[in-house]
Amino acid sequence: MRTTQFFLSTTKEAPSEAELVSHKLMLRAGLIKRLGSGLYTWMPLGLRVLRRVEAVVREEMNRAGAIELLMPAVQPAELWQETGRWAQFGPQMLKIKDRHEREFCFGPTHEEVITDLARREIKSYRQLPLNFYQIQTKFRDEIRPRFGVMRAREFLMKDAYSFHASRESLAATYQAMYDAYGRIFTRLGLRFRAVAADTGAIGGSASHEFHVLADSGEDLIAYCPDSDYAANVELAEALAPAAARGAPQEAMREVETPKQTTCEDVAALLGIPLARTVKLIAVMAGERMVVVLLRGDHMLNEVKLAKIEGLADFRLANEAEIRAVFDCPPGFLGPVGIDRSTIRVIADRAVAVMSDFVCGANKPKFHLAGVNFGRDLQEPDLVADIRNVVAGDPSPDGKGTLALCRGIEVGHVFQLGNKYSQAMNATYLDEAGKAQAMEMGCYGIGVSRIVAAAVEQNHDGKGIVWPASMAPFSVVIVAIGYGKSASVKNAADTLYADLMAVGVEVLLDDRDERPGVMFADAELVGIPHRVTLGERGLNEGVVEYQPRRAAPEQGADARKIAVAEAKAFLMGVLGD
């Protein structure tokens, strides 16, 4: 492709509303153009990247035994009403009516459509298992679309759905898809982690998320550098401390804390570690108050708390409810002296082994020090893991300690079980001729989101640094003075034709532009290999080669390559 025949639309500055690096660079490089809130046109350069990602995804899905189809983007309301999600999905679903006033939605996902297809077409256990996938445009009416295509309203997604006669069969396909996802992200040249995740609203028994590691990621991941363990912080287990509770060494006493309403302030006033303080969080489970105790340096994990019996729909108590029970404002609350006949006390594992700790006195402007379970207050009603892990915690797999990093979710796999098949009566006849609900799996990849995540992970001060497998072109030939020098034109055309003949994706920059502009565009767009041809170099019989991503030992200096050896040299580096 020649730039004079291509649509290259680069800019020096990104719009002020662009926040993430990927959003700024994708706009500046001309990969995308904004149409409206959360709506983007994929420009020719960006579409080339998107199609390369799509090709890798398609190859690995086919390799894993999935069968491609394409379902309608617009879906009838009746299917969603069968599962109850027409009302549950909320305002993210774009609902529309046709000329006959029949209701439809622009599909945010396709569980209902594929389950309807399965119940129509699958009759016998002999037809199972089956695994279908599509690469399809989705629409979710985000309340605040942002970050470019990272969180757009319209996006491209690969979604796959598998159907099974047994949970064992589902588990086998789940593992095959898990492995396929690993191959996809490895082939795309991305640093990623597969993490155990919460099944959330989709439901099911097992779930893993795939995260591209980037400082800008919205999700916090706990992982062990010494093993394969990784989990979303929502699910990462905080093990019980190895040490048992120590014997009391202090008498309980009141300490005046006139302006100190947080554990941090109290610890600073008393000159003690924050880990020696205990904070109380009051929550409501229906009409009953439940008290949650955490170490002062730990944070409540609401996902874990909601999994405790009776707390699935808990909410934080408001100030009026707190004052009605404690006769004390928030900031001075503690577990000593509360009515245990009406208030349930749940303590985190780390709190349960504490002695001589500091907590609120249930008295304005006072805290208690030297507090001990068994002596000054009853043992908790329940001890459970209800906190977020922190860096340095023991890894749940026993193979080291945890570290934390941020990630961008680009893939998610679920074992759905029979949630949708039961709701929609998707059954098959087993060997005994009895109708059984199919077991289902669901496997999604954000194809367009991968592009943005890759930019977040692969950029420098000059622009994008594409992994080779995602780059819109493999080689850019910068022909300085192409329209003015016959020798430059002939050499550039020859190298361009030679590379094209062997299947190399090459961009020939034959514009009448200043060299600085051509170099800046090549670096901004992020093409992995650049060859520069100029009259002076050709007079010496050389061209200049510059990799976009130089290996540390090579440095960033350009190399001079003999004109006659340019093709062979490039084929060598492209094969590395």
From Swiss-Prot:
It catalyses: tRNA(Pro) + L-proline + ATP = L-prolyl-tRNA(Pro) + AMP + diphosphate. Disulfide bonds: none annotated. Keywords: Aminoacyl-tRNA synthetase, ATP-binding, Cytoplasm, Ligase, Nucleotide-binding, Protein biosynthesis. The keyword ATP-binding applies. One of its GO terms (cellular component) is cytosol. Its EC number is 6.1.1.15. It is found in: Cytoplasm. It comes from the Bacteria. One of its GO terms (molecular function) is aminoacyl-tRNA deacylase activity. One of its GO terms (biological process) is prolyl-tRNA aminoacylation. Belongs to the class-II aminoacyl-tRNA synthetase family. ProS type 1 subfamily. Consists of three domains: the N-terminal catalytic domain, the editing domain and the C-terminal anticodon-binding domain. Catalyzes the attachment of proline to tRNA(Pro) in a two-step reaction: proline is first activated by ATP to form Pro-AMP and then transferred to the acceptor end of tRNA(Pro). As ProRS can inadvertently accommodate and process non-cognate amino acids such as alanine and cysteine, to avoid such errors it has two additional distinct editing activities against alanine. One activity is designated as 'pretransfer' editing and involves the tRNA(Pro)-independent hydrolysis of activated Ala-AMP. Homodimer. PANTHER family: MITOCHONDRIAL RIBOSOME PROTEIN L39/PROLYL-TRNA LIGASE FAMILY MEMBER, PROLINE--TRNA LIGASE. This is Proline--tRNA ligase. It comes from Thiobacillus denitrificans (strain ATCC 25259 / T1).
